[in-house]
């Protein structure tokens, strides 16, 4: 979009390197202009591009009703209003940092411990990622990221910091698992280009794959980081959204139990309450670094994106309720697995598969056989049909830097059951129509090939052509028998 007066702005503001020109964001625009509503707009676009967990918000609402003292805006909690309304230290409320550290350990099954003094707040995981980018690298330096990866990393990590993200190419033949060979290849390739590699960024569990990184791979990454003196940033915002085996393993557990000799100054964790707790509107992001200098610098930078004291106060009380948190995590897991099963089984009914996942709020859907050809252009062509005709905002794999065309991320935890059934119905209709068109096209091609393969008989008379024997070879025994 062209704006008037853009020539009066800074290069940063007027530039086009914000990362939002991706098809990932284009699908959101289609939804925003025509959003689906069960009662008022059933023909609208269904939002399946938003990784949001709305399945268990009722549990948080119930807790809030039963604990009015957790809010400073109720008669039960108003006595704390003045304290919370006044200026607070950038470190955050001590009770919030303590509760958050406790919660992070509980989410990881008590297999890792977290120090409240290392908890740094940020306005969501977006701010946390950017803060780490500013802390760990200079403009022009790079982080290696396994593909496919979250499209907004290009904005969050690069736009204002000036760093680069370089792909570690992963492939479907091994379910997109990260290997040491792929990591070394990406690292050496960057070095040959004269690019300084400052770190590795992974999402565990993976967005968009919905899979976890296993213990051995995490140990390999920590070892590689130590040997090559590069940072390892683990985005663990879906750590509490693992709903099936294998069990989740955090980098915090690995460096405590498996590679205690690694250089902890190079290890950093990003966390948030947006996904596991379904509270993206609260804008709570966390940096947890084992590096004292990073903690100090990140705290100074946190003044640009603090979490409100009122939010901290409320969450400190809720996260400290270990019994409730335990029940919430268990019930959330049950609801996530039920939704995942319903969606993937619904796809199987029309022959559509997904990468086998056990975490997250989405599925990695395989539509490769529906492509006109195996190209990124064909994938985007199919995606446009899905968004604008089927009216489902799904995200194409190319927007996640996936090199294999035909994969799509589909979010299914951000809607109620009835909307999910409408979405599945649209997918069923679309796939069946596509199958019918393909069958017709194959029949037409076969008939055309048959016609082309038949001999030409321009020299025969119309009377001869009307004979049942007209299309037989003159040397046929049946023709000779009638002559």
UniProtKB/Swiss-Prot annotation:
Keyword Cell membrane in record: no
Pathways per UniProt: Alkene biosynthesis; ethylene biosynthesis via S-adenosyl-L-methionine; ethylene from S-adenosyl-L-methionine: step 1/2
Superkingdom, taxonomy of origin: Eukaryota
UniProt-listed InterPro entries: Aminotransferase_I/II_large, Ethylene_sulfur-biosynth, NHTrfase_class1_PyrdxlP-BS, PyrdxlP-dep_Trfase, PyrdxlP-dep_Trfase_major, PyrdxlP-dep_Trfase_small
Substrates-to-products reaction catalysed: S-adenosyl-L-methionine = 1-aminocyclopropane-1-carboxylate + S-methyl-5'-thioadenosine + H(+)
CDD domains: AAT_like
Cited SUPFAM superfamilies: PLP-dependent transferases (SSF53383)
Required co-factors: pyridoxal 5'-phosphate
GO biological process per UniProt: amino acid metabolic process; cell division; defense response; ethylene biosynthetic process; phloem or xylem histogenesis; response to auxin; response to jasmonic acid; response to mechanical stimulus
Keywords recorded for this protein, A-Z: Ethylene biosynthesis, Lyase, Plant defense, Pyridoxal phosphate, S-adenosyl-L-methionine
A Pfam family matched in the record: Aminotran_1_2
EC number: 4.4.1.14
Regions annotated as coiled coil: none
Modified residues (N6-(pyridoxal phosphate)lysine): 275
Disulfide bonds listed in the record: none
Recorded GO MF terms: 1-aminocyclopropane-1-carboxylate synthase activity; identical protein binding; pyridoxal phosphate binding; transaminase activity
Enzyme class of the recorded protein, top EC level: lyase
Keyword S-adenosyl-L-methionine: yes
Induction per the UniProt record: Down-regulated by partial submergence. Induced in leaves by infection with the fungal pathogen Magnaporthe oryzae. Induced by phosphate deficency.
Record-stated family: Belongs to the class-I pyridoxal-phosphate-dependent aminotransferase family.
PANTHER family, per database record: 1-AMINOCYCLOPROPANE-1-CARBOXYLATE SYNTHASE 6, BIFUNCTIONAL ASPARTATE AMINOTRANSFERASE AND GLUTAMATE/ASPARTATE-PREPHENATE AMINOTRANSFERASE-RELATED
Extra information: Lines with ACS2 transgene under the control of a strong pathogen-inducible promoter show significantly increased levels of endogenous ethylene and defense gene expression in response to pathogen infection, and exhibit increased resistance to Magnaporthe oryzae and Ralstonia solanacearum.
Protein name: 1-aminocyclopropane-1-carboxylate synthase 2
Gene: ACS2
């Amino acid at each position: 979009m062209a704006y008037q007066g853009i020539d009066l702005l800074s290069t940063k503001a007027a530039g086009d390197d914000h990362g939002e020109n991706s098809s990932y964001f284009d699908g959101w625009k289609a939804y925003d202009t025509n959003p689906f509503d069960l009662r008022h707009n059933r023909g609208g676009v269904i939002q399946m591009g938003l990784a949001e967990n709305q399945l268990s918000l009722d549990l948080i609402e119930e807790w809030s009703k039963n604990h009015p003292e957790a809010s400073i805006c109720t008669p039960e909690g108003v006595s704390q209003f003045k304290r919370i309304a006044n200026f607070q230290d950038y470190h955050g409320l001590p009770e919030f940092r303590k509760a958050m550290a406790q919660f992070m350990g509980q989410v990881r099954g008590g297999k890792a411990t977290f120090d409240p003094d290392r908890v740094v707040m940020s306005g969501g995981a977006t701010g946390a990622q950017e803060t780490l980018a500013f802390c760990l690298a200079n403009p022009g330096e790079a982080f290696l990221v396994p593909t496919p990866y979250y499209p907004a990393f290009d904005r969050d990590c690069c736009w204002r910091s000036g760093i680069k993200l370089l792909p570690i190419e992963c492939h479907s033949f091994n379910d997109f698992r990260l290997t040491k060979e792929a990591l070394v290849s990406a690292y050496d390739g960057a070095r040959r280009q004269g690019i300084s590699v400052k770190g590795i960024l992974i999402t565990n569990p993976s967005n968009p794959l919905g899979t976890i990184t296993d213990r051995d791979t995490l140990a390999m990454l920590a070892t590689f980081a130590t040997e090559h003196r590069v940072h390892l940033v683990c985005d663990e915002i879906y750590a509490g959204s693992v709903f099936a085996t294998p069990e989740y393993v955090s980098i915090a557990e690995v460096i405590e139990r498996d590679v205690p000799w690694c250089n902890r100054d190079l290890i950093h964790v990003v966390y948030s309450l947006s996904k596991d707790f379904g509270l993206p509107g609260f804008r709570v992001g966390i940096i947890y670094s084992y590096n004292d200098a990073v903690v100090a610098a990140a705290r100074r930078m946190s003044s640009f994106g603090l979490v409100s004291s009122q939010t901290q106060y409320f969450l400190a009380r809720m996260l400290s309720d270990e019994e409730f948190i335990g029940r919430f995590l268990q019930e959330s897991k049950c609801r996530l697995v039920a939704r995942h099963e319903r969606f993937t089984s619904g796809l199987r009914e029309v022959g559509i598969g997904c990468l086998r996942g056990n975490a997250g709020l989405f599925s990695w859907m395989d539509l490769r056989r529906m492509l006109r050809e195996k190209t990124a252009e064909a994938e985007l062509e199919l995606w446009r049909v899905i968004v604008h005709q089927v009216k489902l905002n799904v995200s194409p794999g190319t927007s996640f830097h996936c090199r294999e065309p035909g994969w799509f991320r589909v979010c299914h935890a951000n809607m109620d059951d009835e909307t999910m059934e409408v979405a599945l119905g649209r997918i069923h209709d679309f796939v069946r129509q596509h199958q019918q068109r393909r069958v017709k096209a194959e029949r037409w091609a076969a008939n055309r090939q048959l016609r082309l393969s038949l001999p030409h008989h321009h020299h025969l008379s119309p009377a001869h052509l009307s004979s049942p024997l007209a299309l037989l070879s003159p040397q046929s025994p049946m023709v000779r028998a009638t002559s």
